[in-house]
Structure formats: structure tokens, C-alpha cells
């Protein structure tokens, strides 16, 4: 056997045995397993300080049992941790409901719309010329379409106003027409009280909706404070008596968007921060009845994605300062009509020109109907993250009673039949002086996830975060030791090559002596350099 190879293999064995960092003949992994806080690891890789340890400590069957137990615990830990992580990534939420007693509450905005948008007797000849076909009062030839269905006084009025011989039409605006011909609250309102104090039509703000000209009580206006209420129950809210003026309703000879088959008013109770959306969110109040509306304020808080689907930012169009579902719907309708018809309807915000009656009939109303059919895809309006809603409970009684009919006839100079057909009373009040909070909360957060996984680690393998740090620290030390060992080997190989080259003549001399028989075969070995040389 060549002396160089023997010396090289011996040196490598010495390096390997020293590189493991063993103590007392044990591997570094056994030492780590003995010191580790990971339960069961020291029984799988036993470590004993003396060679006379009991055989049961190193029993193969015992090690296999501990290995199976640790493996099963690791599998259960992975399964449970995966389930907890999947639950966390589903972003669950819970909803909490609470009732809060308050000393006072801001009274909601109350929007009232007559179901008839335009007063018949306020129509002018110019109105009929431009909007007669839109209102279904005249046909495309500006003629009365169904004269046999009209009452005598209605037919006489239309016959007079629809004579357009030598008529020169004047400019026409749908906004001005709606403002002028819509029902006037000053004429409709017979009395008004808020918390027992008298109020008037001046306490209402004019707004425009799909029903035309409407009126909002307790609107948010600059320079005015919102009304509050200190008590709940009837008499501590808004009470108004209205005359719906059925004599002014447009005659119905066909189905159009501008004519109504019902009689009464449409009412919406809403927050001052959101615009009225009466045609969808309002409720009807019929004449001949006093309607009591007991309401309760609800303050809702929703979570943003990924836990929920609420929206907190304002609309990009800038038409409304505060985001709400109603504002989003109106903004969507406005954008759709402007894009398709190059105009906007009277109730729509913005600076685009108002649609003409022809654009209303030929474009805006059909486009709005088409949008409503596919609104789920074109108008996606999510709930705001914070909103105020009002629950309502309605009840009603008939008016007038037989005993009060004479008095009301005398007071309002109207017959009992007129009162039954036209007069209504609306009473809006808080059911109690408290509000309800409905709040979405995160059901599972990072702290809960870490707590669950930490609990599973402690239960199954008796580990903690520090145990994981132990594993990482051991892996770091092993990698570092291997790298240092590799570098030392390279340096030794380089230095070994240099030493061999310096003793080449001696090698030749030894080779010449090796042929001498008198050289003993068993020579005492010297240092590594002597052997190599």
C-alpha cells in the first residue's frame, strides 16, 4: 500500500471525526437530541455519557415506538395547523348586535313625494306642445288620443290647450316644467307639528326624484342645525296633514313612466348623508288614513375586503361627498343616461344638459328600463362601511271618523268625500330613545391563529417558538461547520502539495535505497512529513 494514500486516508478520517464535534464518541445530532426541548427526540436518538448504559435505553423496539409516536404527533400537528390556517384564510367574521340608550337622537330626514308628478290644471299650451306626448295626453300628431275616456271638464281643458293652429312654440325646459307644474307643498300641507311645536312648508327642502318634485324635512342644509328629539313615542316626532289634490292628477289613458295609477304619497325615512331613493326605498301612505310610523335608528358597521364587501371611499365622479348605496345607484343611472343619451334627467346630478321631452320618451326612459333589467351587472353598489338605517313599523287608522267628519268639513271647507279621497295624516316618531348597533367583527385574527398553532405544538410535540429556534440554530451550526471543514480541507490539500514538491530529491534517494535488501521491512513511522517524503 502506498504510504501517501495511507497517510491521506488517515488524515481524512481524523478530520471527519473531529469535524462532527462529537463528545465522548457521540454524534452532534445525538448531543442535540439529548439537549433539545422537543419531546421524544432524545428517546429516538439516545445519548449516554458512559459505555455501561442499560440496554433498554438503546432498545431498538423502544426507539421505534417513540419514532412512531413522534411521527403521528407531527402528522396530527400538520393536519390541525393546516385546518386552522385554512380557516384563517377564509377571513371569517361575526356580527354583534347591541342596544344603546341615548339621551337624545338626531331626527331622520323624511322625504315626501306625491305619486302624481304634475298638476293637470297648471299645464300651459306650450307644455302640451312639448310634453303632451310624453305625458300621454296627446298623440304623435298632437291630438287627444282617447276623447271618449275623458271627463267633460278634462276634455274641454285639453281641447282648448291643444289648439296649435298658428301657434309658435316657446323654449321649454324639463327642469323648469317640473319645478313649476309639480305639487306645491304650501298648498298640500294643512298642518305641521314637530314635537308639539308648529312647523310649516318652509321647514322642508325641495328635492327632485323619479316622482318629480318632492320635499325633505330635516335636511342637512348649510347654516341650519339638525333637529333632535328628546323623547320617544307619538307626539314627539313629525306629524303632518296633507291634501294630495286628486283633482290635479293627470288623466290616465295609457301606461307611461310619468303617470300614476295610485293615489297618495310616497315617503322615505333616511339619513341626511344619503340622497332620497323614494321609488325603491319608500313606502306608501294612502288618503283617508292616519299612518303611524314607529322607527328605530340602526348604526351598521361592515368590514372591508377580504372579511366583507363594504366600500368606504367616495365615488369617483364627485357627484356625492359621502358614499351610500343610494348615491351609487343614482350616480350609475346618471352615467348610463349621459353616455347613451347625452343628457340627464331632472333628478340626476351633474352639469350635463337636461333631456328634452323627446329625449325622455325616445332614449332616457327606455335606457333606464334597460339598465334596471341588467342593473346587477352594470351597477354594482356595495354597502358602505358605516351607515345609518331606520327600521319602520307602520300602523294606520281611518279618517275621518263619523263624529269628526262635520268638524273637518267646516275646518277645511271640504266635503267628507273629498276628505276621504284626499286627506292623510303622517306621524313619524322614534319608538324608544335608543339605537341599535350592528357591527361586523373579525372572527379570527393573527393572534388567534398563533395561539391555536402554538397550543397544538405544545399538545402534540411539546414544542414552542424557542424549540423552533433550537432547530434553526442547530442547522446553522452544522452548515457552518461543514463549510469550515471544506475550507480547511482545501487549505490542507494546497499546503500538502507544496510540502511534497519540496522533498522530491529525497523521494528519489529513497527509491534507490528501496532496492537494498538490508533495509528492514518494519521501520518505525515518523511524522506525517517524513512518511510522505
From Swiss-Prot:
What is this entry's stated membrane topology? Multi-pass membrane protein
As its record notes, the protein acts as a catalyst of: Na(+)(in) = Na(+)(out)
Disulfide bridge partners, by residue number: 113-214, 310-385, 328-381, 332-379, 341-363, 343-355
**Extracellular membrane side:** 90-445
Cellular component aspect of the GO annotation: plasma membrane
Location of region: Disordered:
1-23
Task: Please give the Gene Ontology molecular function terms for this protein.
Answer: ligand-gated sodium channel activity; pH-gated sodium channel activity
**Residues on Cytoplasmic side:** 1-68, 467-533
Segments carrying motif GAS motif = 462-464
Kindly state a single biological-process term from the GO annotations of this entry: sodium ion transmembrane transport
Quick one: where is this thing mainly located?
membrane
Subunit record text: Can form homotrimers; probably non-functional. Heterotrimer; could form functional heterotrimers producing channel with specific properties depending on their composition.
Q: What does this protein do?
A: Could form pH-gated heterotrimeric sodium channels that act as postsynaptic excitatory sensors in the nervous system, generating rapid, transient inward currents that fully desensitize upon extracellular acidification.
User: What name does UniProt use for this protein?
Assistant: Acid-sensing ion channel 2
Native source species? Danio rerio (Zebrafish)
Amino acid at each position: 500500500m502506498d504510504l501517501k494514500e495511507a497517510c491521506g486516508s488517515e488524515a481524512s478520517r481524523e478530520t471527519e471525526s473531529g469535524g462532527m464535534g462529537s463528545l465522548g464518541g457521540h454524534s452532534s445530532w445525538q448531543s442535540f437530541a439529548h439537549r433539545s426541548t422537543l419531546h421524544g427526540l432524545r428517546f429516538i436518538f439516545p445519548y449516554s455519557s458512559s459505555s455501561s448504559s442499560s440496554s433498554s435505553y438503546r432498545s431498538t423496539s423502544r426507539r421505534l415506538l417513540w419514532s412512531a409516536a413522534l411521527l403521528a404527533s407531527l402528522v396530527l400537528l400538520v393536519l390541525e395547523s393546516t385546518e386552522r390556517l385554512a380557516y384563517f384564510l377564509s377571513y371569517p367574521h361575526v356580527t354583534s348586535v347591541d342596544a344603546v340608550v341615548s339621551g337624545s337622537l338626531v331626527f331622520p330626514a323624511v322625504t315626501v313625494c306625491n305619486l302624481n308628478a304634475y298638476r293637470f290644471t297648471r299645464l300651459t299650451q306650450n307644455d302640451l306642445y312639448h310634453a303632451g306626448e310624453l305625458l300621454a295626453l296627446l298623440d304623435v300628431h298632437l291630438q287627444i288620443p282617447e276623447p271618449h275616456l275623458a271627463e267633460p271638464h278634462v276634455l274641454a281643458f285639453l281641447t282648448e290647450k291643444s289648439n296649435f293652429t298658428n301657434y309658435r312654440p316657446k323654449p321649454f325646459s324639463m327642469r323648469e316644467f317640473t319645478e313649476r307644474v309639480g305639487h306645491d307643498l304650501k298648498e298640500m300641507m294643512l298642518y305641521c307639528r314637530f314635537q308639539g311645536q308648529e312647523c310649516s312648508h318652509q321647514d322642508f327642502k325641495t328635492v327632485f326624484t323619479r316622482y318629480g318634485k318632492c320635499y325633505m324635512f330635516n335636511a342637512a342644509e348649510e347654516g341650519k342645525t339638525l333637529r333632535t328629539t328628546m323623547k320617544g313615542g307619538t307626539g314627539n316626532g313629525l306629524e303632518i296633514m296633507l291634501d294630495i289634490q286628486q283633482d290635479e292628477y293627470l288623466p290616465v289613458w295609457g301606461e307611461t313612466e310619468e303617470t300614476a295609477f295610485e293615489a297618495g304619497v310616497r315617503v322615505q325615512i333616511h339619513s341626511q348623508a344619503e340622497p332620497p331613493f323614494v321609488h325603491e326605498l319608500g313606502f306608501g301612505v294612502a288618503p283617508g288614513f292616519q299612518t303611524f310610523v314607529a322607527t328605530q335608528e340602526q348604526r351598521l358597521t361592515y368590514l372591508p375586503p377580504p372579511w366583507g364587501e363594504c366600500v368606504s371611499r367616495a365615488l369617483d365622479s364627485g357627484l356625492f361627498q359621502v358614499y351610500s348605496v343610494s348615491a351609487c345607484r343614482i350616480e350609475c343611472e346618471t352615467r348610463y343616461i349621459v353616455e347613451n343619451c347625452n343628457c340627464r334627467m331632472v333628478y340626476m346630478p351633474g352639469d350635463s344638459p337636461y333631456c328634452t321631452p323627446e329625449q325622455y320618451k325616445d332614449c332616457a326612459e327606455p335606457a333606464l328600463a334597460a339598465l334596471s333589467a341588467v342593473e346587477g351587472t352594470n351597477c354594482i353598489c356595495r354597502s358602505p362601511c358605516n351607515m345609518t338605517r331606520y327600521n319602520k313599523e307602520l300602523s294606520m287608522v281611518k279618517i275621518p271618523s263619523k263624529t269628526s267628519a262635520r268638524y273637518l268639513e267646516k275646518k277645511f271647507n271640504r266635503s267628507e268625500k273629498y276628505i276621504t279621497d284626499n286627506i292623510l295624516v303622517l306621524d313619524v316618531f322614534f319608538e324608544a330613545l335608543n339605537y341599535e348597533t350592528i357591527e361586523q367583527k373579525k372572527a379570527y385574527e393573527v393572534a388567534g391563529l398563533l395561539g391555536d398553532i402554538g397550543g397544538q405544538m405544545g399538545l402534540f410535540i411539546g414544542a414552542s417558538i424557542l424549540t423552533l429556534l433550537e432547530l434553526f440554530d442547530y442547522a446553522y451550526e452544522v452548515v457552518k461547520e461543514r463549510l469550515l471543514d471544506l475550507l480547511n480541507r482545501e487549505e490542507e490539500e494546497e499546503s500538502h502539495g507544496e510540502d511534497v514538491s519540496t522533498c522530491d530529491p529525497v523521494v528519489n534517494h529513497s527509491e534507490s535505497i528501496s532496492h537494498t535488501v538490508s533495509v528492514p521491512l518494519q521501520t518505525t513511522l515518523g511524522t506525517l512529513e517524513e512518511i510522505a517524503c
